[in-house]
Amino acid sequence: MLWPLPLFLLCAGSLAQDLEFQLVAPESVTVEEGLCVHVPCSVFYPSIKLTLGPVTGSWLRKGVSLHEDSPVATSDPRQLVQKATQGRFQLLGDPQKHDCSLFIRDAQKNDTGMYFFRVVREPFVRYSYKKSQLSLHVTSLSRTPDIIIPGTLEAGYPSNLTCSVPWACEQGTPPTFSWMSTALTSLSSRTTDSSVLTFTPQPQDHGTKLTCLVTFSGAGVTVERTIQLNVTRKSGQMRELVLVAVGEATVKLLILGLCLVFLIVMFCRRKTTKLSVHMGCENPIKRQEAITSYNHCLSPTASDAVTPGCSIHRLISRTPRCTAILRIQDPYRRTHLRNRAVSTLRFPWISWEGSLRSTQRSKCTKLCSPVKNLCPLWLPVDNSCIPLIPEWVMLLCVSLTLS
C-alpha cells in the first residue's frame, strides 16, 4: 500500500524544480530564407521515480497559449502542429535522451521570432523553459547560382553548361532550375542541386547573355546568375564565313550594277537628244556664218580644202540614203541607228519610203536648208518626236566648219 506524500514534501520539490530543469541551446540563430538550419539543444529535467510515462517535448512560439495553440514542432505523434511550420520545423532530438535539437528547412522570413522548449512527462512533469528561449532571424537570400562552362565554347560544337547551388539544403524542397537566353534551343536535365544544359552555340551567339534562375518553392524565393557567352570560331569556319560574306557582297554589287546600267540605258533612251544652246538661233553671228558657209557649199566651184564641211553636203546630195546624216545628228543613238534605213523614219517636211532615187536626191538637201522656221524643227524617230535645236541642224550642215 502506497501512502500519499506529505504536502510539505511536494512543496519542497516544487521549489527545487528551477534548479533541476535546464536547457542548453544557442541564444540566437540566423539563417537565409530558403535554406536550412540545425539548432543543437540539450534538455535536463529531474528524475522522479513516481512518473512512469514517456518524456515528450515541443517547441512553441513565444506568446502562444499552452492550452489553445499548437507547437511548431513536437515529438508527441498525437499532437498537432501549426500549419505554417508543418513539414519545415522538426524536433530531431529525443527528449527521453535529453536531446531537444531543432531542425528548420525552407526558412521563411515570417519564421523570425522567439521560441521556447517545453517538456512533458505524465502525470506530474510539465515544464516550459521560458528562461532559455531561442531567437531566430531569417534574412534575405544573398547567394547566387554558379554557372560552370567546361573549356571553351566553339561554334557548332555541343557543350554542357552546369548551373548549381552547392549551398542549398539537401533536406529542403528541391529547387527548380530554368535557363533563359535568346540562343537556347536545347534541353536541360537537373539533379537535386544542379542543372545541366546541353547547348550548341552558333557564331551569332557570341556576346549574348545566358541566365540561370533557381526557385526555392518552399520559401517562395528566386535567385539568378547571368553570364555573357564567349563563342570562338575555328580557322576553317572563319574562312567559310569570310567566303560566304564576300560572295553575298559580290552578288549584291553585281545586281546593283545591273540595275544602274538598266536605269542609265532607260534614261538615255528617253532623254531628248539636244546640244546646249550656245550656238545657232541664239547666236545670230554664228548662224549667219553657218548659212553663208552652207550657201558656199552649194556652189559648184566650192573646194573641200577651202570649206571642209562641203564634203558632207555633197555626200548628202549624192547618196541614195540619209544614213550618214543620222550618224552625225544623233550621237546618243548612232549605234542603234547605224545600219537602219531611212524607211523607218519620218520627217515632217520630207516623205519617202525605202531608198532614195536620183530624182529625190535634192530632197535630202532640204534637211539642211536654212528656212524661216528653222528654230525649232521636230524629228519623229520611232513614233517619238525629238525636238531639234537649231544649233543641232547647224552642226549637221557645217559641222566641220564650226568645229
Curated annotation (Swiss-Prot):
Family affiliation: Belongs to the immunoglobulin superfamily. SIGLEC (sialic acid binding Ig-like lectin) family.
User: Residues on the Cytoplasmic side?
Assistant: 268-403
> What's this protein's function?
Sialic-acid-binding immunoglobulin-like lectin (Siglec) that plays a role in mediating cell-cell interactions and in maintaining immune cells in a resting state. Preferentially binds sialic acid to the short O-linked glycans of certain mucins.
**Ranges facing Extracellular side:** 18-240
Q: Which UniProt keywords apply?
A: Cell adhesion, Cell membrane, Disulfide bond, Glycoprotein, Immunoglobulin domain, Lectin, Membrane, Signal, Transmembrane, Transmembrane helix
Keyword Phosphoprotein annotated: no
Q: Which organism is it from?
A: Mus musculus
Q: What is this protein called?
A: Myeloid cell surface antigen CD33
Q: According to its UniProt record, in which tissues is this protein expressed? A: Expressed on myeloid precursors in the bone marrow. In the peripheral blood, mostly expressed on granulocytes.
InterPro entries, per database record? Ig-like_dom, Ig-like_dom_sf, Ig-like_fold, Ig_sub, Ig_V-set, Immunoglobulin_dom, SIGLEC
Molecular function (Gene Ontology), one example: carbohydrate binding
What Pfam family is a match for this entry? ig
Lineage, please? Answer: Eukaryota, Metazoa, Chordata, Craniata, Vertebrata
Instruction: Write down the PANTHER family for this protein, in alphabetical order.
Output: MYELOID CELL SURFACE ANTIGEN CD33 (PTHR12035:SF136), SIALIC ACID BINDING IMMUNOGLOBULIN-LIKE LECTIN (PTHR12035)
Topology with respect to the bilayer? Single-pass type I membrane protein
